[in-house]
């Protein structure tokens, strides 16, 4: 009898916790959520002809310049690299608005090309 009462109590507790966590309101759109941050840098020089714009992610744990390619891929780069500095000084390369996302994107080299591994 004590075992079934304990099991029933545990089940009720789990249901209460689960329903409470599901009823939590989502964060309103106007709340400033973390912008896209990078976990590591793309190590190679990205061909300039592939880049259509860039974003800054400088307030992250790993500061980065995120280049956006013609295929709408985002490539995390080291803002201290000479080639990155050269690209962002190009007046024909627009600074794009920061995206407010709580996700982290990881870019790595695969077959010499940038590859998006995790996008949302």
UniProtKB/Swiss-Prot annotation:
Domain of life (superkingdom): Eukaryota
CDD domains: Chemokine_CC
Entry keywords, A to Z: Chemotaxis, Cytokine, Disulfide bond, Inflammatory response, Secreted, Signal
Signal peptide: 1-23
SS bond list: 37-60, 38-76
Tissues where this protein is expressed: Mainly expressed in liver, also found in spleen and thymus. Highly expressed in LPS- and IFN-gamma-activated monocytes, weakly in some lymphocytes, including natural killer cells, gamma-delta T-cells, and some T-cell clones.
UniProt cross-references to PANTHER family, sorted A to Z: C-C MOTIF CHEMOKINE 16, SMALL INDUCIBLE CYTOKINE A
Family: Belongs to the intercrine beta (chemokine CC) family.
Name of this chain's protein: C-C motif chemokine 16
Organism of derivation: Homo sapiens (Human)
Annotated gene: CCL16
């Amino acid at each position: 009898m004590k075992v079934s009462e304990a099991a029933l109590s545990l089940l009720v507790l789990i249901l209460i916790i689960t329903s409470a966590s599901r009823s939590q309101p989502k964060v309103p759109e106007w709340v400033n959520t973390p912008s896209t941050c990078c976990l590591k840098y793309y190590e190679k020089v990205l061909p300039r002809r592939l880049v259509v714009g860039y974003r800054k992610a400088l307030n992250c744990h790993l500061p980065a310049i995120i280049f956006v390619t013609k295929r709408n891929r985002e490539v995390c780069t080291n803002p201290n690299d000479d080639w990155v500095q050269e690209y962002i000084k190009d007046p024909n390369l627009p600074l794009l608005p920061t995206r407010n996302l709580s996700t982290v994107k990881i870019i790595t080299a695969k077959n010499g090309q940038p590859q998006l591994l995790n996008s949302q």
